[in-house]
Amino acid sequence: MQKTYLLALLVSSLASVRSLADQTRLDLGGSFDSTDSADGGSDNVMIQKSEMNEVIASSELLSLHRSLVEIKSISDNEQAVGEFLIDYLDSKNFTVEMQYVDFDDDTGKTIRSPRRFNIFAYPGNNASPGIILTSHIDTVPPFIPYSLSHPASTSLKRDDILISGRGTVDDKASVACQVIAAMDHLEKHPDIPIGLLFVVSEEVGGKGMSTFSNSRLNSGTYHTIIFGEPTEGALVAGHKGMVSFTLRVHGKPAHSGYPWLGRSAVSEIIPILAEVDRLGDIPVSQGGLPSSEKYGRTTLNIGFMSGGVASNVVAEEAVAKVAVRLAAGDPEDAKDIIFRAIRNVATKNRNDATVVLSNGHERPKGDIEIIFGLEAYGVIDLDSDVDGFNVTTVNYGTDVPHWKIYGDNVKRYLYGPGTIFVAHGKNEALTVGEMEAGLEGYKKLVAKAVERERP
């Protein structure tokens, strides 16, 4: 009797739980079948784990983002994602122009190939819009598949669904948000054209944006350019400049048992790199790199180093690659400071050391070569005059300096969902809430640009 009663009680309890779950089921429109569930409205409703895919599929923004992320588009291999985006924009009645972008091989030779291209889209025949939204469609390696997850609970807020995968943040979140923001704008203001520019190769030198900038498509008729990068939803008032260089030291090989018969390139490069590493901490008056109140100090990163062939051979060559994030000053002045610092250390350790500038492709003319990268620019100041945003500065580089601006009255904004802190990592991800807030941010920036179109 007692067992029968307990069994009946258990069945009744399970039925109640199932009924409650049914009452709080999220429909495809993002709202509840029952009013018992509320906790902040349709943007913040509670859902079940099995409904995450439905949330994505029911949203034009989120489903476009998923399609973009699911397509592998590591730099120099953006063809597939570009073709998808062209088809998508064409289906939304945009006029789409495809611009092929050459690439340089390891020797510096320019290779023409159809495997990557920029995309420039605009409504109808309005090929010279006053407002342009732009982001990049390439990603860093390796490819990480698209996935959805959630906090460790049986249910969660819709906004908290975590979207993971390579490019979810950098930069396909901005691409998706910009497309939907442009469509929303054209629905409200069909008489004010808006352009979409999606470029390749941002992660490897900016060849895509440079190609656009030097082409007929860069008509100079725009008054507002909105660049997309992960800024955590803040407007960026500027970012640091950039100088990069390769340091190559040539030694003389010998048997390690008789090191005095050779000259170790590794032994010579170590003290040089130690000095280079501290240039951002040394005052300019003492030979260091400049700092500023807005951007802080200049930082250097020795990101790559190799040398020698075996432990029992005196190293004949050593190589290091360094990235410099400039907080102030002219990049050419920074190059001079770096050159002098390297020469001073090299000649202090060995009187007959010869330090030379090189393009990296010719026969070396000195013991120590400094090969500065082609990309070099000073700090980039940007506009941040739109109310309702936090304002910040960032340390990373963008395509902004690669776009040649015509005229003095062009507003340049940098904005996007997600954080740069996960952008190139294994944990690259952002939430549904961040994506949808990003879309609203772009809409706000476009609305401000419309005011400039219609004073």
Swiss-Prot record:
Main location: secreted
Binding residues for Zn(2+) 2: D170
GO cellular component: extracellular region
Disulfide bond residue pairs: none
Catalytic residues (positions): E202 (proton acceptor)
InterPro entries recorded: Bact_exopeptidase_dim_dom, Peptidase_M20, Peptidase_M20_dimer, Peptidase_M20A
Residues spanning the signal sequence: 1-21
Gene Ontology molecular function: any one: peptidase activity
Location in the cell: Secreted
Cofactors named for this entry: Zn(2+)
Binding site for Zn(2+) 1: D170, E203
CDD domains linked to this entry: M20_ArgE_DapE-like_fungal
Protein family (similarity comment): Belongs to the peptidase M20A family.
Protein name per Swiss-Prot or TrEMBL: Probable carboxypeptidase MCYG_07204
Species of origin: Arthroderma otae (strain ATCC MYA-4605 / CBS 113480) (Microsporum canis)
